[in-house]
Design a protein with these regions (language model features):
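Active-site core of glycosidic bond-cleaving carbohydrate-active enzymes
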Residues: 408-663
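Extracellular/oxidizing-compartment recognition motifs
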Residues: 1-403, 412, 428-431, 444-447, ...
Length: 663
C-alpha cells in the first residue's frame, strides 16, 4: 500500500540522534487550492506528535509499531476548521532513549496533506514544511520514569508560540532520512474530549530548598548510563525531582465548600491550590495563566491524595511539569499524556493568576459500542469504571497502566484482549499488539527464542519474563477464537516454536522446568519469592501453553509433553491438601518444599492441572474459605494470600466457572 505520494521522512540536519529533540513543523495553504471535500493529513513519526490547524487541535499520535516499522495516521480535517488562509503545525518530540513507551529510533517526520488525490503540501528536504527547534522546551531534563522518557519543562516568554502563526522565517535546514517501512494505523482514531477542571478543594503554603529532607534515589535520575539512557545529572538544565524533594507543605486547608477557578486562581510565592478533576483520567494537561513578574511554577499531579495532599512521586515517576515564566500571558498544553485526578500548581517564586486548567483526554472511542444496565447502580458504576479503564489503557496497545509506563505488557494483554472483544466487538488493538511481536527479525539483548515482556520497548539490560512469553501463546490461542481467519496465527508459528524451544532447554529429567532464567513472575505476592528450583505454578502455565500450542498448530508432540508435565506436577506438588509452590535439590534429589500460596491453587485449577472432580475438597475450600475476608476469619494462615494481579483475576474466573458470579 502507498501511504504517501510525495512526502519523504525528514529531520533537522544532523540532529536525528539527539536526545529529547523537539521540532516544530509548519506549512501554509489557501483554501482556494482545495479541489474537493476530503482533506486528509497523513503522518508517520518515530517520536510523538501533536497536529493543529489554525491553532485548533487535530490529533496526537502515532500508534506504536515494532522496531523499524511506523504506523501512518490519516487525520480527516473538518471543514469548519478551515479559513481562507490556513496554518498547519506539527510538533514532534524525538526522545531517542530506550524506554517501554517509545522505542529508541532516530527522529523523523513524514507528513502529507492531500485533498482527494491532489497533494497540497508534503515534507522533504526542499518540501513545503519549514521547521525549527522548540526552544521553549528544556531539552536536557531528567526522565519521567525508568519506563518512560523525559519529563516536560518549559522556559517561556511571550511570543514563544508565534511560530505557529507563520512568523518563524525560513526555518532550519532539513535533511531527508532513509525511507521507512510503513504500516496502517488500523486501530480507531482516539477521542480527545476536553475535561475542564474548575473545582479547587484545598489550598495552602509550602517551603522550598529544604536540604535536610530525604532525596528520592530515583534510578532514572541517578543511574543514567549504558543500559538506561538519558542526560547525566550534572548536565540537567532543571532538576525537578530534587526541587520537589526540597519542598514541604506548611499549611493545608481543605475547604468545606470547594471554590472555583471562576473565582480566580491567584497564587503568590510559596502558595498552592489543589484542583479536582472529579475522576481519574488520562490526557494532556492544559493551563492558561498570567504573571506580572518572573515566576517559577511546578504543576504536580496524581491519581489520589495522601493525607489530603498531592505526592509527585508516589508512583515512582516524576508527576510534575516545570514552568519558568517571564511576565506575560500564556496558554500551554503538554504533548505527553499523563494520568491524574488531582492537580497542584505550586509557585516557587513570583506570582501567577491561573485562568484555566483542563485535561484533553486520550481515549479509545470504540468502548461506546457496549451498553450495560442493572437495577443495582453499584454494578453500573463498576461497569463504567471498567469501560473507562479500558478506554485509557488501550488507545493503540494493551497497556498495564496509562501513567508511569504506558507499556504494552504481556499477561496483562491476555485479560485485556478478552475485554476488547466484549466492549468494542472487534480485536483491532489486539491485531496491532500481536503484529508488533511478529515483525522484528530478532529482539536485541534477549536470548534466542525469547520475546520481550512488553513491546514495543527497549531492553538493553537484557531483562525478560519467560512466563510472559508463555502467556503470549495462550493469548494467541484465544485470539484464534476471536479471529479464526487471521493471517497472524500461521505467521507467528515460528515465534511460538522459538519460545517453546527456549523453554525446553530448562526441562529436567522429569520434563519439568527447573531454574528458569530471567525474571520468573507468578504474581505480585509471596509467590514471586518461591520461584527457585522447580516452580510448580510456572510449570502449570507451561503445560497449558504446550496444550494450547498443540491445538493451534496440530503438533502432537506438544500435546504429549503438556499432558506428561501435568501428571508430574500432580505427583510432586500436591501434599494431600495443597499444591505447594516449589521443590529444591537436596543431595541432587528434588525435595518438595512446604510453602504453599493461594495463587498456586488458582493456577492449578485455571490451567487444568487440577479439576474440580479430582480435587473436590481443595476446590470447595477455595470457594468457601478464601476471598477478601479470609485473614479476618483466621482461616488457613499458613497459605500465603494472593494479590490482585493475577491471583484474584484467576479466582474470579474460577468463581465464574463454578456458577458463582455474585460471589
Amino acid at each position: 500500500m502507498t501511504y504517501f505520494k510525495n512526502a519523504r521522512p525528514v529531520w533537522l540536519t544532523g540532529r536525528e540522534k539527539e536526545k529529547n529533540c523537539g521540532v516544530g513543523f509548519i506549512c501554509c495553504f489557501n483554501s482556494r487550492e482545495l479541489s474537493g471535500n476530503n482533506l486528509v493529513l497523513s503522518i508517520a513519526s518515530s517520536g510523538i506528535y501533536r497536529a493543529c490547524l489554525n491553532g485548533s487541535f487535530l490529533g496526537h499520535g502515532p500508534a506504536r509499531a515494532a522496531h523499524g516499522y511506523f504506523r501512518v495516521d490519516r487525520i480527516a480535517i473538518p471543514s469548519d476548521l478551515l479559513q481562507e488562509n490556513n496554518i498547519l503545525t506539527i510538533e514532534v518530540i524525538s526522545f531517542y532513549v530506550n524506554s517501554f513507551y517509545i522505542v529508541e529510533q532516530p527522529g523523523f517526520l513524514q507528513a502529507e496533506l492531500q485533498c482527494d488525490d491532489k497533494v497540497i503540501r508534503f515534507t522533504d528536504a526542499d518540501g513545503d514544511f519549514r521547521a525549527h527547534t522548540l526552544k521553549e522546551r528544556l531539552q536536557k531534563v531528567q526522565r519521567y520514569s525508568f519506563q518512560r522518557p523525559f519529563i516536560e519543562a518549559f522556559r517561556l516568554e511571550e511570543g514563544f508560540d508565534d511560530w505557529k502563526k507563520g512568523t518563524c522565517g525560513s526555518g532550519e535546514p532539513l535533511c531527508r532520512q532513509e525511507d521507512k517501512q510503513l504500516l496502517e494505523r488500523r486501530v480507531p482514531w482516539p477521542d480527545f474530549p476536553v475535561l475542564q477542571i474548575n473545582k479547587i478543594i484545598a489550598e495552602g503554603t509550602f517551603d522550598s530548598g529544604k536540604a535536610d529532607l530525604p532525596v528520592w534515589q530515583d534510578r532514572s535520575l541517578f543511574e543514567i548510563g549504558d543500559t538506561l539512557h538519558g542526560f547525566p545529572l550534572d548536565e540537567l538544565e532543571e532538576k525537578v525531582s530534587l526541587v520537589m524533594d526540597g519542598c514541604v507543605t506548611c499549611t493545608l486547608t481543605s475547604g468545606q465548600s470547594p471554590s472555583s477557578l471562576d473565582d480566580g486562581g491567584l497564587l503568590s510565592e510559596h502558595c498552592f491550590f489543589i484542583a479536582d478533576a472529579g475522576r481519574n483520567t488520562t490526557g494532556f494537561i492544559g493551563i492558561c495563566l498570567e504573571c506580572t513578574q518572573a515566576s517559577r511554577v511546578y504543576i504536580t499531579f496524581d491519581e489520589v491524595l495522601l493525607n489530603g495532599d498531592v505526592s509527585y512521586n508516589r508512583m515512582s515517576c516524576v508527576n510534575a511539569v516545570s514552568l519558568e515564566l517571564k511576565p506575560g500571558k500564556y496558554c500551554l498544553e503538554t504533548i505527553q499524556p499523563y494520568t491524574c485526578r488531582y492537580l497542584k500548581p505550586m509557585v516557587l517564586s513570583g506570582s501567577v493568576n491561573i485562568r484555566d486548567i483542563y485535561i484533553r483526554e486520550l481515549k479509545n472511542p470504540a468502548v461506546s459500542q457496549a451498553s450495560f444496565s442493572a437495577c443495582d447502580d453499584s454494578l453500573n458504576r463498576i461497569f463504567e469504571a471498567g469501560r473507562e479503564t479500558f478506554a485509557q489503557n488501550a488507545p493503540d496497545l494493551y497497556m498495564d497502566c496509562p501513567s508511569r509506563e504506558r507499556a504494552g505488557w504481556l499477561c496483562d494483554s491476555f485479560f485485556t484482549a478478552r475485554v476488547e472483544m466484549d466492549l468494542t466487538g472487534n480485536h483491532l488493538v489486539e491485531d496491532n499488539f500481536l503484529e508488533n511481536y511478529l515483525l522484528p527479525e530478532q529482539f536485541p539483548y534477549l536470548p534466542e527464542g525469547m520475546i520481550p515482556m512488553c513491546y514495543p520497548s527497549d531492553h538493553p539490560d537484557g531483562v525478560y519474563i519467560a512466563n510472559w512469553a508463555l502467556w503470549f501463546i495462550l493469548e494467541l490461542y484465544e485470539y484464534q477464537g476471536r479471529s479464526p481467519q487471521s493471517s497472524l496465527i500461521p505467521a507467528l508459528k515460528n515465534r511460538v516454536d522459538g519460545i517453546l524451544a527456549f523453554m525446553a532447554r530448562y526441562e529436567n529429567e522429569d520434563g519439568l522446568l527447573e531454574n528458569i532464567p530471567g525474571w520468573v513472575f507468578v504474581e505480585w505476592s509471596k509467590a514471586n519469592e518461591l520461584t527457585d528450583g522447580v516452580n510448580y505454578p510456572s510449570n502449570m502455565l507451561y503445560s497449558a501453553t504446550l496444550l494450547a500450542a498443540s491445538r493451534l498448530y496440530k503438533k502432537e508432540e506438544y500435546r504429549q509433553k503438556g499432558l506428561r508435565i501435568r501428571c508430574k506436577i500432580r505427583e510432586q506438588s500436591f501434599d494431600g491438601q495443597w499444591f505447594c509452590d516449589h521443590a529444591l535439590r537436596a543431595d541432587g534429589r528434588l525435595v518438595r518444599q512446604s510453602d504453599a500460596t493461594e495463587v498456586c491453587q488458582y493456577y492449578a485449577f485455571f490451567f487444568g492441572t487440577a479439576e474440580q472432580e479430582d480435587y473436590p475438597d481443595l476446590f470447595n475450600r477455595l470457594l468457601e474459605d478464601f476471598g477478601p475476608d479470609r485473614t479476618a476469619r483466621g482461616l488457613h494462615p499458613q497459605i500465603w494470600p494472593a494479590n490482585a494481579f493475577i491471583g484474584n483475576y484467576l479466582r474470579m474466573e474460577l468463581l465464574s466457572r463454578a456458577g458463582r458470579p455474585a460471589q
